[in-house]
Amino acid sequence: MITIRDVARQAGVSVATVSRVLNNSTLVSADTREAVMKAVSELDYRPNANAQALATQVSDTIGVVVMDVSDAFFGALVKAVDLVAQQHQKYVLIGNSYHEAEKERHAIEVLIRQRCNALIVHSKALSDDELAQFMDNIPGMVLINRVVPGYAHRCVCLDNLSGARMATRMLLNNGHQRIGYLSSSHGIEDDAMRKAGWMSALKEQDIIPPESWIGAGTPDMPGGEAAMVELLGRNLQLTAVFAYNDNMAAGALTALKDNGIAIPLHLSIIGFDDIPIARYTDPQLTTVRYPIASMAKLATELALQGAAGNIDPRASHCFMPTLVRRHSVATRQNAAAITNSTNQAM
């Protein structure tokens, strides 16, 4: 996909100059205009008309794209965006992508048509190239929980690898070795990084986890319950589980209780995100805190700066997760022996 950067490179000018030509600015010489339009023709570049319309307009709305605003994680993200928006006397428009590339693309385009010149986008389905083209045309577009090469200053991310290592090391430090992983079936980068962190921490202790230690499901409570049942059915004698997120961990707790397995007496479990449900499960869930509210607030400020042309191109924005200790983890050597009936369930 040809971007405005490709046109600038071909014409031997800056991206800003190409933008001025495409927006019919009078601050461009005839020769420069001719060189840019020649490059546009040769590369068959087609600028986004909606994006061009935004270039010279000020909007009182901020757009935000999330997977599903009904999910507590994304609800917290949107609330944080709205808090910053209100401070700037702006309103928030929301688009849901539901984990689908076409809906993700459509949500962004609709918000552009609504004249949102500041966009906070949680994108997992679109390619780097397509996102780069949107970002080339929308200076106020910022990505959250993803980094597109060349646009790190407009991306706010989390170190998922470190968070997963942190969770797994806590279980290892409590005497656990047979540690399963509840994986998201959506196949996104977050899951790949958390799985890699889990494997990395185990390998530090010379433990090579087999594929059978991984149960997959949708990243929600029903998915976590199904993935945990899958692991239990393999009779693996796991003593601990690290879940992709808190929703999956909560679902896993239901499956474990249904099978007579007491948490953390017989099996320990750790989640990821620290959404409100983690404080209200029984037992309360030990988890890795994802500072989504802080990340969303920063992303919104960056989007507003970008829309105003004031963003720092040298900056980077990567957050570190933290461990939240509650009551779903116990030291393995102090754990109660699993009864015959429970052992059969496992």
Curated annotation (Swiss-Prot):
Disulphide linkage map: none
CDD domains per the UniProt record, alphabetical: HTH_LacI, PBP1_GalS-like
Protein name: HTH-type transcriptional regulator GalS
Feature: DNA-binding region: 4-23
Domain HTH lacI-type: 1-56
Pfam annotation, one family: LacI
Gene3D superfamilies in the cross-refs: 3.40.50.2300, lambda repressor-like DNA-binding domains
SUPFAM superfamilies: lambda repressor-like DNA-binding domains, Periplasmic binding protein-like I
Assembly and binders: Homodimer.
GO BP terms: regulation of DNA-templated transcription
Single annotated GO MF: transcription cis-regulatory region binding
